[in-house]
Design a protein with these regions (language model features):
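Electropositive, gly/pro-rich neighborhoods at or near active sites that engage anionic ligands
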Residues: 61-237
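Conserved catalytic alpha/beta core of Sir2/sirtuin-type deacylases, generalized to analogous enzyme cores
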Residues: 1-31, 38-56, 65, 167-270, ...
Length: 397
């Protein structure tokens, strides 16, 4: 088959294009997002109304919260952010499975006795827990089996307080599939009717490590985000991967061919807002990500953060853009044109609070275009309006 490249003019916030996508979201564009955490979940809930073909590359490096307990107990990648994105993309219409959605979002009480929590888990495995009552077979049987696999492998001292049932189901499936995430994620997608594709950028059990400008080193995503511990006091100089959490052990990860194919075949690639280092740049660390992006002929869009990101101490918008390009270029040849990696910066300078204006000289140097358009509404206040953001991105496809 002979392929040609076609360029065209587009209208941002193209109502006709959006209407067409909304009528047949199953035929919607293949859009790919590099993200992690929960920052993109609201956008995902809007996006699924227009396309069921979005792909979400999610970081599996979270080292805090309930994910930390699972990672320590089973030496596995983090699954909390994967589960969160799967739920955000789940079918919420009457044709979906709200009873499974409710089960997968349920958390055990944080203040409960160990015996009571074990009884709850055992009742789910038996199928006698109230949350299992509305779930019919074969889904009921599948869920019980995955929880059973988790239960059988669970260390005697494992703390179930605050545990998310969806995470336990995913963990059981991971353990039952020879420590592979893809099979259980695929099953999860079918169980909750996920309207898109969610994949971990790597299946490797690794941790984020950062060298700070003051010369100190920290290991663990939870130490970067400023959510579970005090925010950083020195800017991040370099982000890398470590095999161990307690001691820096340099590690490399290779992008799998399945993920490479998803990146190369996307009609649009988005570097969205969220934790700049631990969500966005962390996705670019596996070898092969940058080259897969460069091989994609579609538009690549960067949406900078609004307000204050604890990971971006002292970073101007120019610095953020340069740092993004630095991590993208780390995986490609020196002669790779910048436009193979990034084409657009999407922002709202009138209503948005950015760290600084974007330099026209830098824009020209990188040969990119700035799309300055309304992305913030009164209801979204200090944040991007998810509907406006989705509208702008869909207009570029």
């Amino acid at each position: 088959m002979h392929s040609i490249r076609v360029s065209r003019s587009v209208c941002i916030h193209d109502a006709m294009r959006l209407s067409r996508y909304q009528r047949a979201p199953e035929l919607g564009p293949r859009m790919l997002f590099f993200s992690g955490g929960t920052a993109l979940n609201a956008v995902s809930r809007v996006l699924k109304n227009f396309t069921h073909n979005s792909t979400h590359m999610v970081t599996p490096f979270d080292s805090g919260g309930s994910s930390a307990k699972l990672r320590e107990a089973f030496a596995m990648p983090s699954i909390g952010d994967l589960r969160s994105r799967l739920i955000a993309l789940a079918d919420e219409t009457v044709t979906g499975h709200p009873e499974i959605y409710n089960l997968f979002t349920y958390r055990f009480p944080k203040r409960a006795r160990k015996g009571d929590l074990l009884n709850q888990l055992e009742s789910m495995i038996r199928g006698s827990h109230p949350l299992l009552d509305p779930v019919s077979n074969p889904m009921r049987r599948i869920i019980r089996n995955q929880l059973g696999y988790f239960y059988d492998a669970m260390p005697a001292k494992f703390d179930l307080r605050g545990a998310n049932i969806g995470n336990l189901i995913l963990t059981g499936g991971y353990l039952n599939n020879h420590q592979h995430l893809d099979p259980i994620i695929f099953l999860f997608e079918k169980l909750v009717g996920v309207q898109g594709t969610v994949r971990a950028v790597t299946n490797d059990n690794l941790h984020l490590a950062a060298e700070l400008e003051d010369g100190s080193h920290i290991i663990g995503q939870h130490l970067l985000t400023g959510k579970e511990v005090a925010p950083l006091t020195s800017p991040i100089k370099r982000l890398s991967l470590s095999k161990q959490l307690g001691k820096f052990t340099p590690a490399k990860s290779q992008l799998r061919k399945k993920n490479q194919k998803l990146i190369q075949e996307a009609e649009l690639i988005c570097y969205p807002p969220g934790s700049f280092y631990s969500s966005l740049l962390a996705n670019l660390l596996p070898q092969g990500v940058g080259s897969a992006i460069a091989a994609n002929e579609g538009p690549k869009v960067f949406i900078p953060n609004l307000g204050h990101d604890p990971e971006q101490i002292g970073m101007s918008l120019n610095h953020s853009l340069q740092r993004l390009m630095e991590y993208l270029r780390a995986d490609v040849a020196d002669n790779c044109p910048d436009e193979k990696l990034l084409n657009f910066v999407l922002l709202d300078s009138k209503n948005g609070s950015y760290s600084s204006p974007l330099s026209n000289n830098l824009v020209r140097e990188l040969n990119i275009q700035v799309i300055d358009t309304p992305l913030i509404s009164e209801r979204s206040a200090l944040y991007y309006d998810s509907e406006k953001l989705v509208s702008a991105l869909l207009s570029l496809t």
